[in-house]
Amino acid sequence: MEKLLKSELKVRAIRLGIRNGYHGRVISKMRKKDFIDFINESDCIDLTCDDDIPVNQLKKELQETKKKVNEIQQNAINREREIRREALNREQNLIRVHEDAINNLLLCFSALNLEESQPVQTEPPIDDNNVPENILCPVCLIVKVNTVFNCTHVSCSSCAKRLNVCPICRNPIRKKELRFFRLN
C-alpha cells in the first residue's frame, strides 16, 4: 500500500461518504495516528490511486450532466406550457359552444313566448281593401298597428315595447317609430 498524506486520505474518505470515525468522532477532527489506524482497519476505503479519474474528465461529465438536466427541465417547461395552452383552447371552445347553445335556446324561448302570447284568431281574416288604421298587430291580433320598425314591419306599441327582434323577419330591432295613421 502506498503511503498517502492525511489530507488525501480525508478527501477520499469524504468522497466515499465516510464522515465519522471511531465513536462517531468527525474524521476532520481526528488525530493523524487515530485517523490512519481507522483507515487501515476500514474495509470500505480503497487506498490505491489506480482508480482515480482525472479532474478534467469529471468536470466534462459534470457539464454534460448539467446540460442534460437543463435540457430535460426545458422540455418539461415547454410541455407544461403546451398543455396549459391546449387546456385554455379547449376551455375557450367549450365556452363558445355553450354560449352558442344558450343563444339558440334564448331565441327558441323568445319564439315560443311570442307564439304563446298570440291568441287564437276567431275572426275572419282582414280584407286587403281596408285602410291602415284597420290593420291589426301581427303579434297580439287585437290592437291596431301604430309602430314601425327599422325593417318596415309594424306592430302595436305595447307589443313593440316587449320585442327585441321583428316577429315577421326575425331581424334585430334597432329603431321603433310611433306612427299615427289618418282616419278617412
Swiss-Prot record:
Stored SUPFAM superfamilies: RING/U-box
InterPro entries: Znf_RING, Znf_RING/FYVE/PHD
Gene3D superfamilies xrefs: Zinc/RING finger domain, C3HC4 (zinc finger) (3.30.40.10)
Domain of life: Viruses
Protein name per the record: Putative RING finger protein 175R
Pfam families: zf-C3HC4_3
Keyword Zinc-finger included in the entry's annotation: yes
Zinc finger RING-type: from-to: 137-170
Coiled coil, from the record: 54-106
Keywords in alphabetical order: Coiled coil, Metal-binding, Zinc, Zinc-finger
